[in-house]
Amino acid sequence: MHAKVGDYLVVKGTTTERHDQHAEIIEVRSADGSPPYVVRWLVNGHETTVYPGSDAVVVTATEHAEAEKRAAARAGHAAT
């Protein structure tokens, strides 16, 4: 797993009651882009250092925005 500042970390929900968790990567603590990452969780703005597990993926800001647009379209809402 490799990331850069501005990418997003998405931790996949494991059940229908537990939704995916999204965080913006605001700091990468290694020169090669590997974990740990300092992230800001979108749901509450909390910042923390994470070592992502196998249930997490890194996506670019563009990929994240496109996924949000698709999700909003499925839900019948306009993406912002």
From Swiss-Prot:
It comes from the Bacteria. Pfam families: DUF1918. SUPFAM superfamilies: Cell growth inhibitor/plasmid maintenance toxic component. GO terms for cellular component: peptidoglycan-based cell wall. Monomer. To M.leprae U650M. This is Uncharacterized protein Rv2302. It comes from Mycobacterium tuberculosis (strain ATCC 25618 / H37Rv).
